[in-house]
């Protein structure tokens, strides 16, 4: 509950500064505070008068250091008078001073403050002012006395004693201190030395509390300052001061430039921003107590500057702090008013240059808004201070205006949040006068006639007018009324007394403007029927209704008003004809203001009918579009007694519009208004008529019509695809099933999404369980195509007996058809008898040229832990989600088993597209003022506004996307689980099994061996010969025994090696052992029977049977009973999870919900299309084009960004949740229910036919493991090579695009033009006197054009500045940076030769100027570095022995706005480029992790790492450059008169420019990686590798010889020839000499003998000998390598051949001999080599 009191504070300061500015003296201030302890008793008033006589005041003991200073000199128990603060008036006192009080000051205080010491504690209390105590005076420096320093603690204090005293003190009239009169001098008698003691204390630049938190500030300000208050650099808000009869341009004053370092402000800012509220309050309190001791008027300017910078750097002020600050300035104003003005003629209307910056108002306002909440105890002091500041504000304004000789005068002050006008009027000029205040708070005031002001002007012929316009609400916390627009305050005063103006005969006009950006929500209606009706619901009788009609063309119409009925030409309550005549502003022509007296029917619904005139109807051929706005407004004034806004005595005038409110009031105070747009009822019929204007802008309607046609065509296609998918949703009963078999197995086969994953081969499956195995079954369906890419095929397989718990599954195919390769994802087998299922994760190829090149594979089931692991869930679900939940993509990739149809998906996409369009067009409607495309832009260029609108649309559309995308899947009907009849197990006994023949037993043995070899592929490599092709039973049994033993041993070792796997695999291992046990038992029985019946082989059969018996006993040891097994995780799962009692959605309810979803989609689509068409009709052609581009961008973002992000996020979330809660997988449960429902409908007793002789049932033969086919390896290498080439080309292209997109072809010409402009005659500068003419005739005109300023001639005598210094560079050259700074010349802080706005100050970063009023020390930049001293105070004299070395360097950088036209594509290329860099960084990091230190020995690794590091450095420099640019431009916008240094930005840009060439060079060198695949070009790398040792040796010899000759030339000729003056220049010259480009004439002329010898020997040794040997060694290595080069079949040739075939270019075929040679050699060739 605190208003912005700080705003009043600064309004108050500004006028005070204007008044006191003429007396502001630049005299230096003292730097010591002295305290005089007077040990004679006086009353408070006498003590105060005595201190004033001594040029001081009663001391303010507020600093702990001061207390420590005087503590030892205070007698215990004695009382000392000290100074006190001026407290604000209370509410019970009169808030307006009488005339005598206004002149003489506030009333005298009744209680005064004294100081006393109790032990070591010093305390202050109040007592009657008439009592007589000791007192303490304080001043800067006393008039006379000796001074010496004495150490007291950590501070140095100054003692001062009077040498002699007088009985009386004579005070001159002009030195008399302010006061009501002379006080008795009873206290002024001769004072002994012991009765008066003076203590002096050095003044710090900050109060003690501040210094504790800003220790760095004190150290930063190294220059001595004579000001007692801290000086901080300027702020950045301009202040404008305008007088009557003077233009604003002539009177605008810039903030005063300060020469202090910028670090001073930055340290203080950091300290105050980090300071707590208590510290800030204490600082404000200390300042308030310090200000009360000021007497001179120049102190006011100093206090204002300190407060200005304190408030600018303080983030917030509390209420007590603002009370103290306002109280201090009230005191200063009273002191100002007590002193009569001097030099009246000098004041005039000229604003002094030292005026305090008025932009502090904005800082205090922000601080007030950010202040924290406090208790209500501060409210009353703040309210009183507001009243007092307003009164003193008027008094100061009146005092200022009285100094002007003209009878009428005015001055205007403007800040960021307030505008103030002070004017003096008389009896003849005040009536009917008007005043207008401009930005930021526009207010217009008009006074009534002389008759209404007669009584006032008779009493006061001269009146001072004070008008204030505020852009904020100062009473926001006192009254929560919604005030909109400017707030005006009008005060009249005369003779320093406020005049009460109320109950006038005529109203005073106050016009209050509102912000033009205020949203008014206009409604566009059509006048096609020459009539429209507006319905408004009035809810308040105090407000006035404003009806604004804005036609697109001039119309003559009549408005009729009716209450609760629609008026017409004959039946109405009120009417008005528009446009109006004789209006003040044009927007009043079509505005109707209805006051409360016009709305006499009270609250209710009013109808306004607009009817075109008859002549207008005849002339109106096409329907006209009008924009209608209805709003209510009311005028208020601030009732100061009740602290609230009131409307009594004020009414809304007829000149009110949507942008302003005219208030007519009969009194003067604060005025404000509110504004509210009234909701209005829109007639839909009138809105639909807008479509008659579709010919003006058919973009939106045409786009909607095109989308509708496209939707209809696509829906027809989607409907046909959905019907075709219905045929694929079925359970196929295998044709080779036995009709009498009773055990059913449901097999779900998932084909992967890999490229060419579908197969045309015949697939066979075999199931293996603990109780046996099934027959091989051919998986086929004559009615549909099976095993399509990403498809699901469901088969029903039947067996005679139960297979028990499944442990293996075998798949193979015959490799037939056009595309036999098959990628199988997973297989799920369900046992319908026991309601269990097993998951077999395959994820492999069954092909002869892909994967492991196998056609026959055996898979084992996975456990629960592996099935629900996060890795498996995410990898499997990500593909499913992208193909099924990716809304746009799933229209084409929708799974037939998914119930979310293509038609539904397409409808959802169309709804999202229409929502996208309406959101886009709403943005363009809101931003219609800024949504114009640049005419110079290319037709397909993308603007920033279009990109931002598309991003905003995508963000808003994201939740809508989530809802619409899940609308139909959430209401899918759940299938009911069918009831299957129980199956009677009919297991055949062993006795009933028919005996097998020997051939069948051998086949059984072979099948078992093949199964074991396929199940454990690592056993296949151990078999040296294929014994499974033999018919010898002994060998087969031996092989079977070894395979089983190996399996058991391998399983045991695996369990010991990986203990965590023991809980998963042994359960499957148990079932596998049971299966082997049954197989061995059956084979042993058959072999035993054959041994008894077959006489010629009985021994073999019996031996085999006994061997199988031993193997069976071995298996029994691995098979534990069920009750003895440890608890292990099983690999079988229930077909369906246990139901939780949740009732499924019935079909009827599901159909109803589906209808509701369709209605919702239809309504959303129609509404979006309707409003899109309406909004698009109001867009211009340029806006429609931008809107179309935004729609395209939004759709692309939705397709390529929003949908993928949604899919990845939800896949990650579901995978994470399902890995912990597997029951959440409801989609698979629903699909399983649907499969079971289909299974219940199909008959499994279909007569089947099985041809046992069909070769498809024979598994492919097992061959020894061989290497992958060469064709497969070559394809892989070719694919990798193609990817490397494309990525490398893309990388280089993006790098070139990102670099050259920011370049401008005209930059060279601009650079040359600037260089020629500034370099003219610059080389002729040899002495300091030459510099000033060049700066005057070339530098300044080039910088500022033709403006020459008041002082057109620039000479050394005009400026008191030192010579330029370069402290960073020890060289003696001076550098002039044209783009980086501006030259400034100063004389005691004032500019010369240029206006101050063009010469902001000393800001050159590389130059230092010594500017001082004192005798200066000059350090000229000559080679001797002499130090010269000038003692001349008024002139400039120096001695210069050396001369300048002139050097000019020009640096420039491109602004961000210059490349904004095509910046979108540049940004896209940069983003993709840095993504590739991140990818390369990841690859290099992986290689570094693998290779460790060997990574740095690879040349390609170093090259790639260098590119990555330089790219990231460039990214950092770009970010730094953008940050600096935005920072500099923000500073420029804040204060355009302030100097902005671009030095740092230029340096960063220069570093980036020099560095950007290296990645281009390295990326070009990296193209060698592409050339090395050609055998002809690879010979170069091999040559360098072979000759590397010799090359290094020769390079070392050349370097040694070059160093020796460079040193010799430098020592012999360095003093005489400039080319050899340093070692490096000598080395460069020697290299040029060897290349033949150096001039040796100077060497021959200086020393013919020695010079000739050195040059001749260097040429012979280095050129003719060493370099020739170096080249010869390389040529020899090249010859050897060329002879050993063989013709190789490189991949690059294959790639070129494929590319030629793709483009239709004939490729020459090789002969048979060349092909044979190539094939013979190609197998031993390594294609991938390291880059040399």
Curated annotation (Swiss-Prot):
Keyword tags: Calcium, Calcium channel, Calcium transport, Cell membrane, Disulfide bond, Glycoprotein, Ion channel, Ion transport, Lectin, Membrane, Signal, Transmembrane, Transmembrane helix, Transport
Provenance organism: Homo sapiens (Human)
Activity control: The non-selective cation channel is gated following an off-response property by acid: gated open after the removal of acid stimulus, but not during acid application. Regulation of non-selective cation channel activity by external Ca(2+) is bimodal, first sensitizing and subsequently inactivating the current.
C-type lectin domain sequence ranges: 30-138
UniProt subcellular location: Cell membrane
The name this protein goes by in its record: Polycystin-1-like protein 3
Recorded topology in the membrane: Multi-pass membrane protein
Top-level taxon in the UniProt lineage: Eukaryota
Subunit structure: Heterotetramer with PKD2L1, composed of 3 subunit of PKD2L1 and 1 subunit of PKD1L3.
